[in-house]
Regions:
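Intrinsically disordered/low-complexity terminal segments and short unstructured peptides
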Residues: 291, 396, 413-415, 454, ...
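Residue-level detector of alpha-helical secondary structure
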Residues: 365, 369-372, 376, 384-391, ...
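Extended intrinsically disordered or low-complexity segments
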Residues: 2-380, 385, 392, 451, ...
């Protein structure tokens, strides 16, 4: 399979099973990541070579716990768009507070969380239980570990507030309260149960996603898996909290975040108004999986619709990621018939016609064929291209070996292949001789230890 076109996106065509028994199909996953560049939330596309790959779900691994950091990029198309936000609450102007509200406002949806400093349940003089004084804070992570929950809580097994935590005094049966709560459903009484709240991704094994998966029966595991249960609710695919799921986001939407920036009480991030367009080419002649030949009879572009699937905003690491997905229907031969090309358009501009993109695509094919012919006709150019591809790694290794700086400069120059090869051989001979001398010195040193009056290593070393 050959991918032609813009590469500042990550593209992965993934073969999947149709859950309705329709056979295999291609799920096209397109991903683009932007850096959040400055204090007002402007975005800049990350360079092509630094674009993060399409990956599975990732979790935190730190002192707070192991909650999910990002959902996986693969998986079937969602009915609603996930918007997931990772970040912290910051006290305005850096002055410690006991509590504050953090809010997100996206496309008319407004969500507020109340963030508290550390608290715990404590016994009063009458033998009852009260909430302790709140410790002021300047920064508080907004994560599931800081929300209501416990190991036995199906909605948040990593949370706090309903079971004694491991750091509590063993003589004290009481425990910490959560730092992150719903301002409309606050904990006020000992033993009260509330729903965990947050902005982050919900793992598949937690509620409500677990119940949406469907019936896990012996029949399912024996006769239908790995296809999902027939009674699966497609809401299972969404990882964002329900109030962070959207029917449509076209770009240009502004996300306003309050008390989630270390210096400013309000931050606005405008979603990119550009989106990729993806096409496939049904070839007109039989091909095998190794075939990368192109000709102009193979350029009938057919567009596959891409829908925005997931938005991840990570304010801690300062990036925004968009993931689109599009499905090629199962009746298409997915194994050997496709050639992909994708480009980007601003949503505020008129879409280019298939004819315009077809002409551009044909120009790219002609350019590729010309480059292929040049390499085939000139083997030295092909060899030099290979050498160029590995030069960075060679230079890095030579620097570690403290090679001649002149050699390193030569490798980065436009010297001929013969000149580079000659100097490389000479330098490696020198390095080999130097290493052999060092080895002999070490052997002599070890022998001297055996002849020394004392056998104490520290004294003879």
């Amino acid at each position: 399979m050959l991918i032609v076109g813009k590469n500042d996106f990550k593209l992965a065509p993934v073969v999947q099973n149709d859950p309705n028994g329709g056979g295999l199909y291609f799920l096209n996953i397109v991903k683009r990541t932007y850096a959040i560049k400055d204090d007002i939330g402007s975005l800049e596309a990350i360079p092509e070579e630094e674009q993060p790959d399409i990956v599975g779900a990732k979790s935190y691994k730190d002192d707070y716990g192991r909650s999910q950091k990002y959902p996986g990029d693969s998986g079937a198309c969602k009915q609603l768009i996930d918007v997931i936000i990772n970040g912290c609450a910051f006290a305005p102007e850096g002055e410690a507070v006991e509590e504050l509200d953090v809010t997100i406002n996206i496309a008319g949806k407004h969500k507020t969380l109340r963030v508290f400093g550390n608290r715990h349940w404590e016994r009063n003089e009458a033998g009852g239980v009260d909430i302790s004084a709140t410790q002021p804070f300047t920064t508080m992570p907004i994560r599931w570990e800081k929300a209501f929950g416990s190991l036995s809580n199906r909605w948040n097994p990593l949370g706090m507030g309903s079971e004694k935590d491991h750091e509590t005094d063993p003589e004290d049966p009481l425990f910490s309260l959560p730092n992150v709560e719903n301002p409309e459903d606050l904990l006020t009484q000992f033993g009260q149960k509330v729903r965990p709240v947050g902005f982050s991704a919900i793992p598949e094994a937690w509620e409500p996603r677990r119940s949406f998966f469907g019936t896990r029966s012996a029949y399912w595991s024996s006769f239908r898996a790995p296809l999902p249960p027939k009674d699966q609710d497609l809401r299972y695919l969404n990882a964002a909290p329900e109030d962070q799921q959207f029917g449509d986001l076209i770009g240009n939407e502004i996300i306003i975040l309050t008390n989630m920036h270390e210096r400013f009480s309000e931050m606005a991030i405008k979603l990119p108004d550009s989106k990729p367009r993806l096409f496939y080419v049904p070839r007109k002649r039989p091909v095998d999986l190794q075939d990368t030949e192109l000709d102009l009879q193979d350029t009938e572009l057919i567009e596959t619709y891409l829908k925005l699937d997931t938005v991840v905003i990570d304010l801690n690491e300062k990036f925004l990621t968009l993931v689109w997905k599009g499905k090629l229907e199962s009746q298409i031969n997915v194994l050997d018939t496709f050639l992909y090309m994708y480009g980007v358009e601003d949503s505020c501009e008129p879409s280019k016609s298939i004819g315009e993109i077809q002409r551009k695509f044909e120009e790219e094919i002609v350019a590729l064929e010309w480059a292929r012919e040049m390499i085939d006709e000139n083997p030295e150019k092909k060899i030099n291209k290979v050498v160029s591809d590995v030069t960075d790694q060679i230079v890095k290794t030579l620097k570690e070996l403290k090679a001649d700086p002149a050699l390193i400069s030569l490798l980065a120059s436009t010297a001929t292949l013969d000149e580079k090869e000659k100097m490389l051989r000479a330098e490696f001979d020198n390095l080999k001789e130097s290493l052999e001398k060092d080895l002999m010195k070490q052997k002599e040193k070890i022998r001297s230890w055996g002849n020394a009056p004392s056998t104490n290593f520290e004294e003879t070393n």
